Amino acid sequence: MTETIYHLPVPATVALLADLHDRPYFSIIQSLSDRRPATICIAGDVVFGDPPKDGNLLIQTQKYVLPFLRACCALAPTFLSLGNHEKAVCGEDLQRIRDTGCVLLDNSWTTYNGMVLGGLTSHFVLDFRRLREKKHERYPDRGSEPRVIKEPETGWLEEFERQAGYRILLCHHPEYYPRYLKRRDIDLVLSGHAHGGQWRIGSQGIFAPSQGLFPRLTDGVHDGRLVISRGLSNRAPVPRLNNPPEIVYVQN
């Protein structure tokens, strides 16, 4: 795992984590313990896997997620937004996440120490919620039913933009930025999802979900305010190549 530091005009050091996918986390916590950021921002995809069929909660099938969140919260205030892999989590799962002390930002915002932190929820999550409400099941099976919701819910961002303070938006999907966020008054957008392009040739990623071949938004700083993490693990059938997992620190 690599540590990457970007210097931007943030009021305090922010750690950006993304795409844990329920993997071991000791080296991540060691880095956070050494660096001591003021806040820890997790831009989605902490969970991995399909809902259980035995009546248990999805979060109960995750070996590392809750201990990881507790360990983060013991080091610094921790904020979490929802990525595409959180699509199946139900209300009970989300409550277990909140019980760790983590602040869940689900198309919502909060304030902390002069900062305004928001979380833009993945449209995959919204579509599964629609299915859940329709079928009145904790973990509905999509089956052959087509996906209906294909865009994030952005109406609440108008209020978020008006808040006084340094505005940080956790947004799992970097591809949302050009269409939904570029023209908004937001100081910092923190993303993941692209896994650095999975294989990298020099600075170019080869493939990213939602962007396809030779994606543009896989890591680094874009437009002076979009920061993308290459992610903390790999659950894809294709291994990473020239693309180590990454924890990002944004500091002044």
Feature map (PLM): residue ranges:
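Acidic, histidine-bearing metal-coordination/catalytic regions of metal-dependent phosphoesterases
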Residues: 1-15, 20-21
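Acidic/histidine-rich helix-loop elements
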Residues: 14-26, 46-61, 88, 125-143, ...
